[in-house]
Amino acid sequence: MKRLLSWLTGALVMAGLLSSLVLPSAVYAEEDLLGKYSGSEIRNVVDDKIAEREGKVDLNNSSVRRFQQFPGMYPTMAGKIVLGGPYNNVDDVLELDLSERQKELFAKYRDNFTVTPPSIALNEGDDRINDG
């Protein structure tokens, strides 16, 4: 009786394993879906906002780290700019409490900045200071 029970259990396990090879799994995506949604066609709010700034640093939506490319601005002046927003135009930065040296630095790099409306996707959670 024990031998019969072990043979039946073995046969049941083998049948289950073989059926898993025959039946399609639910995790495979259909080929037409892979072709339809692969590539650069998928975009989200953040991608659109990044494309909107055209390679410049957006004063309302950039983190402090984006200012590292400008010598003398990171981290002190960049922190002041990030915390001082939102801005309506680039020249609003000059209304901050900046030293003369910092104002000269900003004027030097002014053409590298732009202002777009603040986006909640880029400003949520105060990640602009330490986006680690």
From Swiss-Prot:
One of this protein's GO BP terms?
photosystem II stabilization
Q: Main subcellular localization, coarse class?
A: membrane
Which superkingdom? Bacteria
Q: Which topology term describes how it sits in the membrane?
A: Peripheral membrane protein
* Keyword line: Electron transport, Membrane, Photosynthesis, Photosystem II, Signal, Thylakoid, Transport
Q: Where in the cell is it found?
A: Cellular thylakoid membrane
Q: Which Gene3D superfamilies does this entry report, sorted A to Z?
A: Photosystem II 12 kDa extrinsic protein (1.10.150.320)
Keyword Membrane among UniProt keywords? yes
A Pfam family it matches:
PsbU
**Signal peptide residue numbers:** 1-29
On whether Methyltransferase is a keyword of this UniProt record, the answer is: no
Spell out the InterPro entries in the cross-references.
Answer: PSII_PsbU
Q: Which GO terms describe its cellular component?
A: extrinsic component of membrane; photosystem II oxygen evolving complex; plasma membrane-derived thylakoid membrane
NCBIfam families in alphabetical order: PRK02515.1 (NF002708)
This protein's assembly is summarised as: PSII is composed of 1 copy each of membrane proteins PsbA, PsbB, PsbC, PsbD, PsbE, PsbF, PsbH, PsbI, PsbJ, PsbK, PsbL, PsbM, PsbT, PsbX, PsbY, PsbZ, Psb30/Ycf12, peripheral proteins PsbO, CyanoQ (PsbQ), PsbU, PsbV and a large number of cofactors. It forms dimeric complexes.
Q: What does this protein's UniProt record list under function?
A: One of the extrinsic, lumenal subunits of photosystem II (PSII). PSII is a light-driven water plastoquinone oxidoreductase, using light energy to abstract electrons from H(2)O, generating a proton gradient subsequently used for ATP formation. The extrinsic proteins stabilize the structure of photosystem II oxygen-evolving complex (OEC), the ion environment of oxygen evolution and protect the OEC against heat-induced inactivation.
Which family does the entry's similarity section mention? Answer: Belongs to the PsbU family.
**Protein name as annotated:** Photosystem II extrinsic protein U
Q: Which organism is it from?
A: Synechococcus sp. (strain CC9902)
Lineage summary: Bacteria, Bacillati, Cyanobacteriota, Cyanophyceae, Synechococcales
Tell me the gene name: psbU
